[in-house]
Amino acid sequence: MQVCWFERFGGGNQLLTVLSSSRTCYARFVNFKVFKRMENYRLRRNMPRTGPCKLLLPLSCGISSSVLLHILNAQIQHELAKSHPSPGFDLHLLVIEPSSISHSSLSYDEGFELLQQTFPLHSFTRIPLHSIFELDPELQEVISQFSKDGFVDDTGLSAKERLDAFRASIPTSTSKVDVDYILITRLVVAFAKKIACRGVLWGDTDTRLAAKTLANVAKGRGSSLTWQVCDGMSPFGVEFNFPLRDLFKAEVDNYASFFPELTRIIIPDEPPSENVLTKNLSIDELMMRYVQTQGEKYPGVMANVTRTASKLQASLMPANVPQCSFCGAFMLNSGNNDGGDTTGASRALELCYACIRSRPELTC
C-alpha cells in the first residue's frame, strides 16, 4: 500500500511522508496553497482589470523564495496556455547580490545566468546592497545622524565603502540583523516604486513568519507586525504579501527536492553551529532556532503564532502621524521620542522606540 502526502508518521517529528509515486499530488497541494493567496492578483479583485499589474519578487536565492518563483512561474505558464486567460500579473525578479550583504557569500554570477535561463518569462535585475544610496537618497541623511559619534559618513568614499562603514558601526548581533533587514526592505521598496510595482511578494514561510513575529515583539517592533507578517498595505505605499504563509519550511524543503532545476540555483542555508554561545546570537536567530525545533514537536502551536498575528489590523492613522526616519513605522507616541536630532539645515531625525534601541550608544 502506497502512502500519499497527507499521511503522516506517528512519530514526534510530524514530517510529511512523501513517496515518489505521490510527488505530483504533493506538488499540486503546495501549488494550491500559493494559488489561493495569489487569487486577488490573478483575478484583479478591487483593482484595474486593464493594463499591467506588476509585482516584485525579491529573490534571496534561498529555498523559500526560489520555490515561490517556481510555483508562480508554473501558474503563469498555465494561465497563458488558456484560450481566455485571466488578467493576471507580471512578475519582476530582484536579486540583491549576496556577496554585497555578507562577505562570506560568493558572487552569484553563474547562478544569476542560470536563473534567467530557467525562467525566461520574467524580467530580472541584480543590484548590490549599496545601490540603496542611488535608489533611496534620503537614507544618506538618516545614516549620518543614526550612529552619532559611532560613525562619520565620508561622502568621498565609494557607496560600498560608506555602507560597509555604517554597518560596521552597529555593535551588537541583534542590532546588526535588525539594521540589515531595514536596509534590505528600504532597497526593495525603492526599487519597487522605481519600476511602478503594485506590490512585493515576500518568500516567507509560516515558520519564518512565526519566528519574525516573536523576534519583532522582543525587539519592540510589535506595532509593525501588521505589515511585516500580514498581507496588505505597508507604510511605504506598496502592498506586502506572503504567498507561502500557509506552508511550513519542511513542506517547502520537500517541494524543492523534487525539481533538479531548483537545486542548481538555490544557495543552501548554512547549518546552525552548535558551538555558538547564545549571547552571540541575534534575537532573530534565536527565535528561528526556537521555532524550527519546537515546530517539529508542536507544528500546530507554531502555526497558531502566525495565524494569530495575521488577524492584527492596523489602526486608521491620522494624516499627520510621523513615520520613523529609518524603518518607516508609524509613531503614535512620537511626543515621547528622544531620538530626534536637528543639526543646522538638516531635518529632525525621528526614530521609533525599536530603532532608538539599535543605535550604537544605546546598545550594550
Curated annotation (Swiss-Prot):
Organism superkingdom: Eukaryota
InterPro entries according to UniProt: CTU2 (IPR019407), Rossmann-like_a/b/a_fold (IPR014729)
GO molecular-function terms, A-Z: nucleotidyltransferase activity; sulfurtransferase activity; tRNA binding
Pathway: tRNA modification; 5-methoxycarbonylmethyl-2-thiouridine-tRNA biosynthesis
Gene3D superfamilies assigned to the protein according to its UniProt record, in alphabetical order: HUPs
Keywords, sorted A to Z: Cytoplasm, tRNA processing
GO cellular component labels: cytosol
Compartment list: Cytoplasm
Keyword Cell membrane annotated: no
Biological processes, Gene Ontology terms: protein urmylation; tRNA thio-modification; tRNA wobble position uridine thiolation; tRNA wobble uridine modification
Role description: Plays a central role in 2-thiolation of mcm(5)S(2)U at tRNA wobble positions of tRNA(Lys), tRNA(Glu) and tRNA(Gln). May act by forming a heterodimer with ncs6 that ligates sulfur from thiocarboxylated urm1 onto the uridine of tRNAs at wobble position. Prior mcm(5) tRNA modification by the elongator complex is required for 2-thiolation. May also be involved in protein urmylation.
Family: Belongs to the CTU2/NCS2 family.
Protein name: Cytoplasmic tRNA 2-thiolation protein 2
Species per Swiss-Prot/TrEMBL record: Aspergillus fumigatus (strain ATCC MYA-4609 / CBS 101355 / FGSC A1100 / Af293)
